[in-house]
Regions:
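Hydrophobic helix-coil surface modules that form long, contiguous segments used
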Residues: 1-6, 11-167
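Catalytic Zn2+-binding segment of zinc metalloproteases
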Residues: 170-179
Length: 179
């Protein structure tokens, strides 16, 4: 969501300066993976609960549910996930390590630079079909257009641009999301 769009999804005071913790429960097809701002706990087939968040602006509340293919890792105690639709699985698996390496390097640099550890728990990066923005810095669950998963040989500039977008969205965790 963007600023002032959360009101289209749920009842809220949709102002960036008003923050609240969120606890979300999702009912989705049992075969789907549910991702969001908090760590997901499967309660029963098709029922997922997302951990209560730190106080967030309303437009950061994020739920990404679908038959995702996922590559998971961990860096410095932070669970990481890279997710895309199943039809992109071979491309995601081929490119995931480069994105994990960029993500890890950014965490190391931002922790050093800002002196504040990443405060939002898990860090998922979800490549969403038909996403109308380049990317969105949702705490714990950053969304990107799925065109950033390359379907063929990528130029060095394309890889750089994706890496730059990953770094940019992560910087928002400290500048925008945390404050």
């Amino acid at each position: 969501l963007e600023v002032a769009d959360a009101r289209r999804v749920y009842a809220c005071f949709d102002q960036p300066d008003l923050k609240a913790p969120y606890t979300v429960s999702v009912t989705a097809p049992a075969a789907w993976t549910v991702l969001g701002n908090g760590a997901a706990t499967l309660l029963a087939p098709g029922r997922t609960s997302l951990a209560t968040t730190r106080p967030l602006a309303s437009y950061f509340v994020t739920i990404c549910a679908g038959p995702w293919v996922s590559v998971r890792a961990e860096h410095d105690g932070i669970p990481l996930g890279i997710h895309a639709r199943r039809s992109l699985e071979p491309h995601l698996r081929e490119q995931a390590q480069q994105m994990i390496d960029v993500t890890a390097a950014c965490f190391d640099e931002y922790h050093r630079l800002f002196g504040i550890r990443y405060p939002f728990g898990e860090y998922h990066q979800v490549f969403v079909p038909e996403f109308n923005a380049g990317a969105m810095e949702n705490p714990g669950c950053v969304t990107f257009r799925d065109q950033m998963i390359f379907r063929g040989a990528a130029t060095p500039d394309q890889v750089f641009q994706r890496s730059n977008t990953i770094a940019h969205e992560m910087a928002h965790m400290w500048f925008g999301d945390l404050v």
